[in-house]
Curated annotation (Swiss-Prot):
The modification S-8alpha-FAD cysteine is found at residue 307. It comes from Salmonella dublin (strain CT_02021853). Its cofactor is FAD. Its EC number is 1.5.3.-. This is N-methyl-L-tryptophan oxidase. GO terms for molecular function: flavin adenine dinucleotide binding; N-methyl-L-amino-acid oxidase activity; sarcosine oxidase activity. FAD binds at residues 4-34.
C-alpha cells in the first residue's frame, strides 16, 4: 500500500499532523520508536505553557493565534479541557529584552496584555515578591496545556478517522526516489508520496546534517498550598532573574507547583546520556534562586523529571523541506518552546502533504538561514 504521507515521530507535532492530514482525506501512516505519549521526548510532564504575546519574536504570533484556535477546537473533544485559561504573567527587569518583545508583539497584534509595576504586581498576587525595578506583563487570555492529554486525543481522533499507526517500531533508514519516500522499520518497509520528519531530539540519527543539539533539561514539583492554585486565580508564569536566567512555572495542582529553568541544561549526544532527575547534583536545586526570591512561600522539592530540548543554533524553529528532497518536510529545532505550536505545525504539515502553499510566512524558519 502506498500512503500519501508517512510521519516519522508521533510526539507533539507528529500526532497533530497525523490527525489533521487524515481529517483532510489523506492516507496517513504515523510511526514512532516508542508508544506515544511517552517519556523519551519533550512532551511529558503533564503541562506546557501557552503564551500569545511572544517574547521570542513577533514572527511567531500569527502561528500562535492559529494554534490557539486549534487548541480551543481540540478541547471540545474531551470532557477534561486540554487548554486551561489561567493567565500568564511574565516577570522581569523593566529593561528586559524578552519583555520588550512581549510588549512589542502585544502592541502589533492588539493582544490583551496588562503592564504592572512591582507594587501592583505584588498587590494582585501577594505570593509573588519582586525587586522595585521589576515589571509584570500579564496575558489574561493565555494559560497552560495538558500535553499528554493532547497527544492522546490527537492519536485517538486520527485512529478513529482511519489513520494507520505503527508504534514501538524505530525507523532505521529513509530512501528517496522519483516516486516518493520509503522508510525501513523493524516491521518492514513502507512507501508514501511524501514524508514528515518530526522525530524531535534524535532527528540527527536519520538526518545527520541537521543543525540540532540535544540538551538534557529538568523540571520539578514543589510543595505548595491553595494560595498558588487557579482557584485562587494564581497564574502560570515566566520569570527572568537579574543575571538573565529564565524560569517558567504553573499554578499548583494537588498542592504541587511545577517549575523549570528554560536556559542551561547539559549538552548530550545519545538517549542514554539523558540521565533521570537527580542524577545530576544540581537538579534538585536548579529552581531555588527563583523560588527563594520570587515565590518564598513554596516548600521543598517533591519530585522531578528529565526531558530533552532539540535546540537549533538560534533557538528558532526549523520548518523546511530537506535540501534536494522536496517531498520530505522536516519540523525540528523547537528549542524548548514548541509544544504550544503543535497544532498549527501539524496543520502546516498536512497542507504540505496536500500540495498546498502555507498561508504563513515560513521564511524565518528555513534551513538556508544557517548557511548565510
Amino acid at each position: 500500500m502506498k500512503y500519501d504521507l508517512i510521519i516519522i515521530g508521533s510526539g507533539s507535532v507528529g500526532a497533530a499532523a497525523g490527525y489533521y492530514a487524515t481529517r483532510a482525506g489523506l492516507k496517513v501512516l504515523m510511526t514512532d520508536a516508542h508508544m506515544p505519549p511517552h517519556q523519551q521526548g519533550s512532551h511529558h510532564g503533564d503541562t506546557r505553557l501557552i503564551r500569545h504575546a511572544y517574547g521570542e519574536g513577533e514572527k511567531y504570533v500569527p502561528l500562535m493565534l492559529r494554534a490557539q484556535t486549534l487548541w480551543d477546537e481540540l478541547s471540545t473533544h474531551n470532557e477534561e479541557p486540554i487548554f486551561v485559561r489561567s493567565g500568564v504573567v511574565n516577570l522581569g527587569p523593566a529593561d528586559s529584552a524578552f519583555l520588550a518583545n512581549v510588549a512589542r508583539s502585544a502592541q502589533q497584534w492588539q493582544l490583551n496584555v496588562e503592564r504592572l509595576d512591582a507594587t501592583a504586581l505584588m498587590t494582585r498576587w501577594p505570593e509573588i515578591r519582586v525587586p522595585d525595578n521589576y515589571i509584570g506583563l500579564f496575558e489574561a487570555d493565555s494559560g497552560f496545556l495538558r500535553s499528554e492529554l493532547a497527544i492522546t486525543t490527537w492519536l485517538r481522533l486520527a485512529r478513529e478517522a482511519g489513520c494507520a499507526q505503527l508504534f514501538n517500531s524505530q525507523v532505521s533508514h529513509i530512501h528517496h526516489d522519483d516516486n516518493g519516500v520509503t522508510i525501513e522499520t523493524s516491521e518492514g518497509s513502507y512507501h508514501a508520496s511524501k514524508a514528515l520528519i518530526s522525530a524531535g531530539t534524535w532527528v540527527k540519527a536519520l538526518v545527520p546534517e541537521l543543525p540540532v543539539q540535544p540538551v538534557r533539561k529538568v523540571f520539578a514539583w514543589f510543595k505548595a498550598d491553595g494560595r498558588y492554585s487557579t482557584k485562587n486565580r494564581f497564574p502560570a508564569f515566566t520569570g527572568e532573574m537579574p543575571n538573565g536566567d529564565q524560569y517558567y512555572g504553573f499554578p499548583a495542582e494537588n498542592d504541587e507547583l511545577k517549575i523549570g529553568k528554560h536556559n542551561g541544561g547539559q549538552l548530550i549526544q545519545a538517549p542514554e546520556e539523558r540521565k533521570p532527575f537527580a542524577a545530576v547534583a544540581s537538579d534538585g536545586a536548579e529552581a531555588f534562586p527563583f523560588l527563594r526570591n520570587v515565590l518564598p512561600g513554596i516548600g521543598g522539592c517533591l519530585h522531578g523529571a528529565a526531558c530533552t530540548y532539540d535546540n537549533s543554533p538560534d533557538e528558532n524553529f526549523i520548518i523546511d523541506t530537506l535540501p534536494g528532497h522536496e517531498n520530505t518536510l522536516v519540523i525540528t529545532g523547537l528549542s524548548g518552546h514548541g509544544f504550544k505550536f503543535a497544532p498549527v505545525l501539524g496543520e502546516i504539515a498536512a497542507d504540505f502533504a496536500l500540495g498546498k502553499t502555507s498561508s504563513f510566512d515560513l521564511t524565518p524558519f528555513r534551513l538556508s538561514r544557517f548557511s548565510q
